[in-house]
Amino acid sequence: MSSKVAINSDIGQALWAVEQLQMEAGIDQVKVRVGASAGGGKRWEHMGQGTGACLGLVWLNQLVCRCPKMAADLLKFCTEQAKNDPFLVGIPAATNSFKEKKPYAIL
């Protein structure tokens, strides 16, 4: 019986992995690598650009970004999603399942 449970678990994990990979296949990704910059911070370089000078350098939180479009897209996504983030806007007390319920007295 335990082998049957293990097989079902393996199938479930495989199905989850396939679903995850299918989702990731549809995402347009930009490859970046981290290198040391002269200023002591980290520098993100687009893999296809090499190490030459880039006119479109953008400073983001002490990082020199060689992919300003990618950084702008990420910043846009974060600001759009911020209104739905429970860590930023909080959870309404009526829907918070972790909030302690008010005690009541049994008569």
Curated annotation (Swiss-Prot):
Question: Which keywords are on file for this protein?
Answer: Cell membrane, Membrane, Transducer
UniProt subcellular location: Cell membrane
- Does Membrane show up as a keyword for this record? yes
Task: List the InterPro entries.
Answer: G-protein_gamma-like_dom, GGL_sf, Gprotein-gamma
* Cell membrane found in the keyword field: yes
Name its GO BP terms in alphabetical order. G protein-coupled receptor signaling pathway
Please name one Pfam family that this protein belongs to: G-gamma
Q: What are the disulfide bonds?
A: none
> PROSITE patterns from the xrefs?
G_PROTEIN_GAMMA
Record domain G protein gamma: where: 69-107
Provide the GO MF annotations for this entry.
G-protein beta-subunit binding
Principal location class? membrane
What's a GO cellular component annotated to this UniProt protein?
heterotrimeric G-protein complex
Family in the record: Belongs to the G protein gamma family.
Role summary: Guanine nucleotide-binding proteins (G proteins) are involved as a modulator or transducer in various transmembrane signaling systems. The beta and gamma chains are required for the GTPase activity, for replacement of GDP by GTP, and for G protein-effector interaction.
Q: How does it assemble?
A: G proteins are composed of 3 units; alpha, beta and gamma.
Q: What is this protein called?
A: Guanine nucleotide-binding protein G(I)/G(S)/G(O) subunit gamma-14
Provenance organism: Homo sapiens
Recorded name of the encoding gene: GNG14
